[in-house]
């Protein structure tokens, strides 16, 4: 399996919008502040043509144009890693326009996004045999202050950490809105890990973690993009994680 190089000091972070872009508030201001933060940290940023566009239905633009943006950004040399602008609802319409054969031949890059971006992060692994990150989208990096999960996401792209873990609290209701675009995660609920079957102790497992948003995974079942069986036959160590659909698209 192909694992991309980590983001280096003064490297370039690219942004694409194969699902929602950051054309409206609170995402517009949060995305602008995220780019400012990255610049202060010494990174360069590069935006695809759809990042600030709101012409599509459930996505930033026409599906063909969204696919073109993703293909060119991934296969091009203008950036070193890619972070999606946001989640959404209809990235499934972009999937037929993604050149997975070209991506499999291109130099691998870390791609990070969540929710609707399962349509790329999951298929990047199962079709193009290239690892990707199910993690926060671009606007999240505009929050003040950064939640540890946001810092960990960047550190993961940079290779500064090689392990991920739970946090003490999770967000049930976001307080980010048009008047508070830089609000951090509103974490109020304690994390509770439940093991099934009940009563089991010291559960450990090892394998290759793949998965994503449940809605997206269900939509891919049985289509020409469903290569899970072949992926399982190649590696025989798959651990599937389903994620509920988050309400916050960014």
What are these regions (language model features)?
Residues 20-23, 86-91, 115-119:
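Gly/Ser/Thr-rich loops at beta-strand to alpha-helix junctions
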Residues 1-78:
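ATP/NTP phosphate-donor binding region
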Residues 210, 216-240:
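Oxyanion-binding "anion nests"
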Residues 241-248:
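Conserved small/polar residues in nucleotide/adenosyl-binding loops
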Residues 100-123, 131-138:
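Short, acidic/small-residue loops that bind anionic groups at enzyme active sites
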Residues 137-215:
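Conserved anion/nucleotide-ligand pocket segment
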Residues 87-103, 124:
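Short Gly/Thr/Asp-enriched flexible loops that form oxyanion-binding sites at enzyme active sites
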């Amino acid at each position: 399996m192909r694992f991309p190089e980590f983001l280096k000091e003064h490297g370039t972070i690219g942004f694409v919008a194969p699902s929602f872009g950051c054309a409206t508030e609170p995402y517009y201001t949060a995305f602008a502040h995220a780019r400012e933060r990255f610049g202060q940290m010494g990174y360069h940023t590069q935006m695809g043509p759809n990042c600030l566009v709101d012409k599509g239905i459930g996505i930033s633009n026409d599906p063909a144009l969204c696919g073109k943006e993703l293909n060119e950004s991934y296969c091009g040399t203008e950036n070193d890693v890619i972070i999606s602008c946001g989640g959404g609802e209809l990235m499934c319409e972009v999937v037929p326009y993604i050149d997975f054969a070209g991506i499999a031949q291109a130099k691998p890059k870390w791609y990070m996004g969540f929710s609707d971006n399962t349509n790329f992060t999951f298929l990047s692994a199962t079709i193009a045999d290239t690892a990707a990150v199910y993690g926060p989208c671009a606007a999240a990096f505009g929050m003040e202050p950064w939640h540890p999960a946001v810092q960990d996401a960047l550190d993961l792209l940079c290779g500064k950490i090689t392990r991920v873990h739970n946090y003490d609290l999770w967000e049930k209701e976001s307080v980010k809105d048009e008047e508070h675009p830089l609000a951090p995660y509103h974490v109020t609920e304690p994390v509770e890990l439940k093991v099934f079957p009940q009563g089991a102790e010291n559960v450990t497992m090892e394998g290759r973690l793949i998965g994503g948003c449940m809605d997206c995974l269900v939509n891919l079942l049985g289509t020409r993009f469903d290569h899970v069986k072949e992926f399982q036959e190649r590696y025989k160590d798959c651990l599937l994680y389903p994620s509920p659909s988050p309400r916050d698209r960014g």
